[in-house]
């Protein structure tokens, strides 16, 4: 059954109610923070944000007698938006509650625009982005390519991960193998695993050890199952595919950071069906298509749009098979989705 469309007045009323609730929550949080800061606070110490719950976060103490312990912390109003993976300075209060007083500089951040077009960080201080897809829901090359552009833009190393490899059959196998071959030819690291059967999980663990990684991908591709297989004590809830849509049901509601026994961390983020790139420029997108890089600037016309123009280096490469149609379609789709002012 299709979702009922809301009219403008209904949308306005929903936003108004949500805004009022958010304002009341913020007022309660500010009152709690004032009471906390009015009492005795411990010395400043370093911490790591391991989960975010709206107006509060969970912080793991990084030094001192409480190192390794987790505290629920309030946020001072003058702080920038914090995300899982942020390193912070915090002070402990009473009853296991603390206050974050400063954010440490980020080495990297993975961002995406929200529904209002405002840039929203997803995870901080990550160095490996694991792009997860599966035979079902059907993988979309455009979404994979959007993640690859985001990885290049953020300076993160990508790892393509096909989960549920045990579901490959005669029907979906040819298309999947053709999809994977495109990225293998480009030199992207790629693994095939099955979190359910354990196939390939040891090789995946070796790739993750020593890195701060984030799993991204559509809902339903098995990110939570991967976390449960890698970290059995994590207890991440697993969801099924929606019967009517074939899309995954969301299970992870907030990004959470987990530690690996041999070193390294994993951030499990909520499922993302559409990954916007409105915060990047045309140059950033072009840089994200690694096989296109040497071709840009070699077209006959300086303002070539790589559509039907004569003397286009990209169209020639496409005709000669040096660029795959799948990648060209993704490039055109992403460029078309950019805001006019990013050109």
Curated annotation (Swiss-Prot):
Query: What keywords is this UniProt entry annotated with?
Result: Cytoplasm, GTP-binding, Hydrolase, Metal-binding, Nucleotide-binding, Ribosome biogenesis, RNA-binding, rRNA-binding, Zinc
Q: Which InterPro entries match?
A: G_CP_dom (IPR030378), NA-bd_OB-fold (IPR012340), P-loop_NTPase (IPR027417), Ribosome_biogen_GTPase_RsgA (IPR004881), RsgA_GTPase_dom (IPR010914)
* Enzyme Commission number(s): 3.6.1.-
Q: Does the keyword rRNA-binding apply?
A: yes
Q: What is the role of the protein in this entry?
A: One of several proteins that assist in the late maturation steps of the functional core of the 30S ribosomal subunit. Helps release RbfA from mature subunits. May play a role in the assembly of ribosomal proteins into the subunit. Circularly permuted GTPase that catalyzes slow GTP hydrolysis, GTPase activity is stimulated by the 30S ribosomal subunit.
Give the matching HAMAP family: GTPase_RsgA
The text of the family note is:
Belongs to the TRAFAC class YlqF/YawG GTPase family. RsgA subfamily.
How is this protein named in the record?
Small ribosomal subunit biogenesis GTPase RsgA
């Amino acid at each position: 059954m299709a979702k009922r469309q809301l009219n403008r007045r209904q949308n306005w009323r929903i936003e108004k109610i949500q805004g009022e609730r958010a304002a009341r929550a913020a007022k309660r949080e500010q009152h709690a923070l004032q009471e906390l800061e009015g009492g005795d606070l411990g010395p400043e110490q370093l911490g790591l944000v391991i989960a975010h719950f709206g107006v509060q976060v969970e912080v793991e103490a990084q030094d001192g007698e409480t190192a390794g312990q987790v505290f629920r912390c309030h946020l001072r109003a003058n702080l920038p938006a914090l995300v899982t993976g942020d390193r912070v300075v915090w002070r402990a209060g009473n009853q296991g509650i603390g206050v974050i007083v400063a954010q440490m500089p980020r080495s990297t951040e993975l961002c995406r625009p929200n529904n209002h077009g405002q840039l929203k960080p997803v995870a901080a201080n990550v160095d490996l982005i694991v792009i997860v897809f599966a035979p079902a829901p059907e993988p979309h090359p455009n979404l994979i390519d959007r993640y690859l552009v985001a990885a290049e833009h953020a300076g993160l190393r990508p790892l393509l991960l096909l989960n549920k490899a045990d579901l490959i059959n005669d029907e979906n196998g040819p298309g999947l193998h053709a999809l994977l071959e495109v990225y293998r030819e480009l030199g992207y690291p790629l693994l095939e695993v099955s979190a359910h059967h354990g196939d390939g999980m040891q090789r995946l663990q070796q790739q993750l050890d020593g890195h701060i990684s984030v799993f991204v991908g559509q809902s339903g591709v098995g990110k939570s199952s991967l976390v449960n297989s890698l970290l059995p004590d994590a207890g991440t809830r697993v969801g099924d595919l929606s019967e009517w849509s074939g899309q995954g049901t969301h299970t992870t509601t907030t990004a959470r950071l987990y530690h690996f026994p041999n070193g390294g961390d994993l951030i499990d983020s909520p499922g993302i069906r559409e990954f916007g790139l409105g915060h990047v420029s045309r140059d950033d997108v072009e840089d994200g298509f690694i096989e296109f890089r040497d071709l840009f600037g070699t077209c006959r016309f300086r303002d070539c749009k790589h559509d039907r123009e004569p003397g286009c280096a990209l169209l020639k490469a496409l005709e000669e098979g040096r660029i795959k149609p799948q990648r060209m379609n993704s490039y055109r789709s992403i460029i078309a989705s950019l805001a006019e002012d990013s050109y």
